[in-house]
Amino acid sequence: MANPLPPRPDLIAAVATAPGRGGVGVVRVSGPDVGPLAVAILGRLPEPRHVTYCRFLDRAGAPLDEGIALYFAAPHSFTGEHVLELQGHGGPVVLDLILQRCLELGARLAEPGEFSRRAFLNGKLDLAQAEAVADLIDAASAEAARSALRSLSGEFSARIDELVEQLVRLRTLVEATLDFPDEEIDFLEQADAFGRLKAIGTSVAAVRSQARQGVLLREGLTVVLVGQPNVGKSSLLNRLAGFDAAIVTEIAGTTRDTVREAIQIEGVPIHVIDTAGLRETSDPIEQLGIARSWEAVEKADVALLLVDAAHGVGAHEAQILAKLPDVVRLTVHNKIDVAGEAPRATADEIWLSAKSGEGVDLLRAKLLQAAGWQAAGEGAFMARTRHLDALDRAARHIEQAGAVARQLELFAEELRLAQAALAEITGEFSADALLGEIFGSFCIGK
């Protein structure tokens, strides 16, 4: 009986497929000492990048399972290290036996996102690409998946690298002027440095606009439905969801708690929250529901105030509007089928029927407009809030550089800060705490 191999801190293993039962399950191992582990569990080291059908063996040499082994020799692997993938039957017990055998042979259980983190540290992916791995897995729509794949292929990073390169060239001109102050040549004027700075600022704004679309695809928009009881909030939720997500009756106050449903409009996730009708009541349960309604409003991106189209906005609705926080507000005149109105929309009002569906497409368009959504197109890429923050800081430093352009030391420093902000996106400059936060949100097998 073979003795267990000593633990190897640099050898990691994890189940790479989703929990539960399936036809195939994958255990992934990565690290410099994959070879001895492969020999112990397979009886041989498979030929790199070839499919090998074999048995997976326990300590006594008895089979745990049989399946396919794939060996990728460094640096030609996802992590840049030696990688072994064991593809067996997808039952949780079988996969656990294979994983435990790997741990017995000296591997340790991988931390969340550790495979992707190693790929980043070994230069196989930059940080934006590594994040796109998780975004592709979590994509809730075809548009989100396509955008994540573009980021994974490096389109977003290429835009950032281009901006960084332009800043580096501009910084070189400034440094040359500082290093040769007595020369008659004005490097900055000859190279149109200030025109180039303006062009960089325009490019940063364009990239930020695209990144904002990616954030919308990833995070979506939270929309809360508010109004008096029995104005059709639950009916509108059901119409948007396409099924009966909330109970609808003629009895006022049927909805006592918030009801949440996720929908998609042109691939953008919209989180719709139905709330209890806002009114004065002595019912303690309804009071609790109304309190939760206001909590939902505080966290929303858009508040839809529903009113009966036959009555319009009255004193009570005006009070609700006055209490709404600083969010996008749209007044929805529901029940136009009863009031005899036609579907239409103005800047901040919509006339529709949740019951018949008339005018609901106008609402969908308004929600996308409120989100700032533009047609994704072929150039859209996935992005995160931290990317927007970095682009905002870069834009501010570029603007400040223009304000201090004649003070060359300050000009150079603002350009450096803009470059550093952009470099955070791809991970060229990133604190360990940031890396831990990003990769810690990944699943274990990635």
Swiss-Prot record:
Class of the enzyme per the UniProt entry, highest EC level: hydrolase
Gene Ontology CC annotations of this record: cytosol
Cofactor comment: Binds 1 potassium ion per subunit.
Sites where the protein binds K(+): 230, 249, 251, 254
A GO biological process held by the record: tRNA methylation
Cofactor(s) in the UniProt record: K(+)
Annotated binding of GTP, by residue: 230-235, 249-255, 274-277
Binding site for (6S)-5-formyl-5,6,7,8-tetrahydrofolate: 28, 85, 124, 446
Main localization category: cytoplasm
EC number from the UniProt entry: 3.6.-.-
Binding annotation for Mg(2+): 234, 255
Keyword GTP-binding annotated: yes
Disulphide bond pairs: none
Keywords, comma-separated and alphabetical: Cytoplasm, GTP-binding, Hydrolase, Magnesium, Metal-binding, Nucleotide-binding, Potassium, tRNA processing
InterPro entries: G_TrmE, GTP-bd, GTP-bd_TrmE_N, GTPase_MnmE, MnmE_dom2, MnmE_helical, P-loop_NTPase, Small_GTP-bd
Chain's role: Exhibits a very high intrinsic GTPase hydrolysis rate. Involved in the addition of a carboxymethylaminomethyl (cmnm) group at the wobble position (U34) of certain tRNAs, forming tRNA-cmnm(5)s(2)U34.
Similarity comment: family membership: Belongs to the TRAFAC class TrmE-Era-EngA-EngB-Septin-like GTPase superfamily. TrmE GTPase family.
Subunit text: Homodimer. Heterotetramer of two MnmE and two MnmG subunits.
Stated name of the protein: tRNA modification GTPase MnmE
Organism listed in the record: Thiobacillus denitrificans (strain ATCC 25259 / T1)
